[in-house]
Amino acid sequence: MSDSSAALSIECVRVNSLDIPQARDLDTIRRVIEVAGQGPTTLPNLMELTSFSKRHVHYRTHAARALGMVTMSRDPVLVTLTSAGSEMLATAPYSKGEAELLRKGFESGPLGPFASMMLATPAPTLDVFAAAVGAAGLLSPATARHRAQGLLAWRTRLLGEAKGTQSEDRQLILF
């Protein structure tokens, strides 16, 4: 399927804008899932246990929900691990098992309409994918582009092609 034909098929679908995540780093989304794995938790508790800002906790929790890894109840908001989230936590980060579960969550949840386009080979161009995201989510072009970039950042990990980095490799060396 070409970029343009996939984009046309997505334009016919509507996706709630809350279901199109703003979180681009699957490691931080996984951290939210890990905390939810300790038992139902509130957003303030997630902030405390992850050291993420309120805004970023919201972004990452909505992304985990869109992937089917957590649920969110209302009044009070409680974030609870799903069986898919539990299965994912039993896998190692960056493993084929994790990729399979993340991909399954992506394909079967509210992000499903984007799956065939995002996971296609070759990858869609940012412009074409952003247009599809914008049309499906009724988003402004700038917002659609930002969210499309975030989703495309997940692509290699969902396909099982991402390589994990050890924490030592990610540290800033000052001396």
Question: What are the residue ranges of the model-derived segments?
Answer:
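Donor-sugar nucleotide-binding helix/loop cap in glycosyltransferases
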Residues: 2-175
